[in-house]
């Protein structure tokens, strides 16, 4: 049956035929084409040329997160819109790989040999990082792999001790960040293990860096808690609520000392009666400002789950609670940077001023919903939970991935 959509397609086809140049399509026509594409093709389209990329940035399309899930230790990928479940092995990921972080269309993964690699979900391109068994710069630590199949992957070995590395310690006691420039291919990876070790790698380095001895963390009784990366700087949140900053813009990473306003002014928050802070994370806005985000369980008249966001007033050097993060920015809890978002809700509650999260932000005993991810509106403190499906329940370990954005 002939429909108005058929007429529109014919009109578009005619204009394209007359134009003969896909890069010079009328912006309105190009935008309508881009917004009609599947999630995967939508993000591939921005790489066609600079004109397409410029138009792509103006599109209003729902930010539907893909879900990376582990079902009985098998890696699965769910693409919204297509309503399909893919096995990790079908897209190029092995079952013994574990998600660590994401950036753009890329995932940072680690396997059971503690082998790190970054993987583009749209192109299946894979970049292997140097082996952790090779020489590590900056600290007296090395990794010894367990070559027998078993629970333990190996050990980090120092002169006075050995620390076990296993699936549990990697998935539960590690934090990681990935940044990649999709056009130049430059990238930076950093990760925390066991709150004790911080490693980093920048494209072009001949080995990993270890920062433990550089800062003498253990003698100062300090631990690494979280990290974020933006604008060539790595921000590290440590115990006692201090924040260190490392500049990666040069050949070698250098700690920023004089121009780091956060070190001498640690974050402080006194909980109110009935408040329980479960997790603390940092994130960097596009302006470069640092945010500290708390996931809070408030036990007052009835239990309520909340998020609090704090930002330093750079004039007074006082951390202040904020109710907004900008007109076109939103957060994925634990991701480390804000991402571009539509001002109005275009689906699932995801819009500017919202926080997308998975349910492990709350204590293990507290299960506020049957599903495993939701969206928190900062303005109203209301949570919109995702729709329940066969894989969307609190017993499935889930990570959220926004291709092209985070």
UniProtKB/Swiss-Prot annotation:
Domain F-box: 20-67
Signal peptide segment: none
UniProt xrefs under CDD domains: F-box_SF (cd09917)
Pfam families: Beta-prop_KIB1-4, F-box
Name under which the protein is recorded: Putative F-box protein At5g38270
């Amino acid at each position: 049956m002939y429909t108005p959509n058929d007429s529109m397609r014919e009109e578009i086809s005619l204009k394209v035929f007359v134009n003969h140049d896909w890069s010079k399509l009328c912006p309105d026509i190009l935008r309508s084409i881009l917004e009609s594409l599947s999630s995967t093709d939508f993000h591939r389209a921005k790489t066609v040329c600079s004109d397409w990329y410029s138009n792509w940035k103006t599109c209003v399309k729902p930010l539907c997160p893909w879900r990376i899930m582990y079902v009985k230790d098998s890696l699965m990928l769910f693409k919204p819109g297509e309503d399909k479940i893919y096995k990790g092995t079908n897209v190029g990921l092995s079952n013994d790989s574990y998600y660590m972080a994401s950036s753009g269309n890329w995932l940072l993964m680690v396997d059971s040999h503690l082998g790190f690699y970054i993987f583009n979900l749209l192109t299946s391109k894979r970049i292997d990082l140097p082996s952790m068994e090779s020489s590590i710069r900056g600290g007296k630590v090395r990794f010894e792999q367990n070559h027998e199949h078993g629970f333990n992957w190996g050990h980090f070995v120092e002169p006075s001790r050995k620390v076990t590395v296993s699936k549990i310690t990697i998935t539960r006691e590690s934090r990681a960040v990935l940044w990649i420039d999709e056009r130049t291919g430059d990238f930076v990876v950093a990760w925390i293990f066991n709150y004790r070790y911080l490693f980093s790698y920048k494209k072009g380095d001949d080995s990993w860096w270890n920062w433990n001895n550089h800062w003498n963390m253990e003698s100062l009784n300090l631990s690494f808690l979280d990290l974020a990366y933006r604008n060539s700087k790595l921000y590290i949140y440590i115990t006692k609520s201090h924040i260190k900053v490392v500049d990666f813009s040069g050949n070698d990473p250098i700690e920023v000392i004089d121009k780091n306003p956060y070190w001498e002014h640690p974050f402080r928050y006194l909980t109110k009666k009935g408040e329980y802070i479960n997790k603390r994370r940092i994130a960097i806005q596009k302006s470069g400002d640092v945010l500290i985000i708390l996931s809070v369980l408030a036990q007052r008249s009835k239990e309520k789950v909340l998020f609090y966001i704090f930002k330093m007033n750079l004039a007074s050097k006082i951390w202040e609670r904020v109710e907004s993060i900008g007109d076109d920015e939103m957060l994925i809890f634990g991701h480390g940077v804000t991402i571009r978002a539509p001002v109005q809700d275009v689906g699932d509650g995801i819009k500017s001023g919202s926080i997308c999260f998975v349910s492990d932000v709350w204590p293990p005993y507290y299960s506020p919903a049957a599903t495993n991810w939701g969206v928190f509106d900062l303005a109203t403190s209301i949570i919109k939970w995702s729709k329940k499906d066969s894989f969307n329940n609190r017993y499935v370990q889930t990570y959220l991935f926004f291709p092209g954005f985070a």
